[in-house]
């Protein structure tokens, strides 16, 4: 209908209700201003009109039909959801509508639904008019888990009160996370104080007996943490020394290898020189042997000749 317009209600906490509100589009409705009087038959038809099963009218009725809303059907075996509570609260609160609430625009209704703290001027009179009635239903359906200190606060506005409830009411997960963070901060401060007392060099250089004597009076967790740090530092020092020794040994082996390669080259050169000398001596020996054999032949031929002077002597 053109004259119907949804009125802002506090946002529910049920996921199903939030999904319903997110999927509901208010921009498709038009606002038509018309006088309140002169159409009593229209108000009667609105009171007698039946709504479909499972649907909830999100528009206010211009003329209140009854001061007491119709109570929903109750069944012992029926599980009442938060969405049904929302429907019942919405239908009961819309019975008392101020005439000023009809001068609204879709933008004002959207701003009221998304939870703006600055309410439109048209809604302020309506909200102050139904504050007490809405506070009664909110105490029945939504504020069962609120502490007594929070319930004692003055109720200025239903929407503001709901935001304050969500901001100030401590949840179990939030309290547990805050206590865990405080515990971790205390542990970190105590461990940092113990670790700052001893330097890394002192932890490594001290013996176990000296360390136990210095750790008297500390908690068990601090002692275990400090000993674990000392063990880590010693293992790190051992690893660094082993790495240094390994690198140094590698350099030494590489230097020895270079020297041995040079010595091998020198020995090869010496062998080649000796081989050349051997060949030269062998050639010289062969030449001497050939000369001796030729001289011996010449001497033998002269001794066999009878005409030589030596033959007669």
Curated annotation (Swiss-Prot):
Please tell me one Gene Ontology term that the record gives under cellular component: nucleus
Residue span of region Basic motif: 225-250
Alphabetized InterPro entries for the sequence: bZIP (IPR004827), bZIP_Maf (IPR004826), bZIP_sf (IPR046347), Maf_TF_N (IPR013592), TF_DNA-bd_sf (IPR008917), Transcription_factor_Maf_fam (IPR024874)
Give the GO biological process terms.
regulation of DNA-templated transcription; regulation of myeloid cell differentiation; regulation of transcription by RNA polymerase II
What organism does the record attribute this protein to?
A: Xenopus laevis (African clawed frog)
Q: How does it assemble?
A: Homodimer or heterodimer with other bHLH-Zip transcription factors. Binds DNA as a homodimer or a heterodimer.
**Which residue stretches does the UniProt record annotate as biased composition, category Low complexity?**
55-76, 167-192
Principal localisation: nucleus
Q: Tell me the PROSITE patterns matching this sequence.
A: BZIP (PS50217)
The name under which this protein is listed is Transcription factor MafB
Q: Which PANTHER family match?
A: TRANSCRIPTION FACTOR MAF, TRANSCRIPTION FACTOR MAFB
Q: Where in the cell is it found?
A: Nucleus
Compositionally biased residues, Basic residues: 154-166
Family classification: Belongs to the bZIP family. Maf subfamily.
* Keyword terms: Activator, DNA-binding, Nucleus, Repressor, Transcription, Transcription regulation
Region Leucine-zipper: which residues? 253-274
Query: A Gene Ontology MF term for this entry?
Result: RNA polymerase II cis-regulatory region sequence-specific DNA binding
Physiological role:
Acts as a transcriptional activator or repressor. Implicated in the regulation of cell-type specific gene expression and play a role in inductive events during lens development.
What residue stretches are annotated with the bZIP domain? 225-288
Which residues does the annotated region (Disordered) include? 51-77, 151-197, 292-313
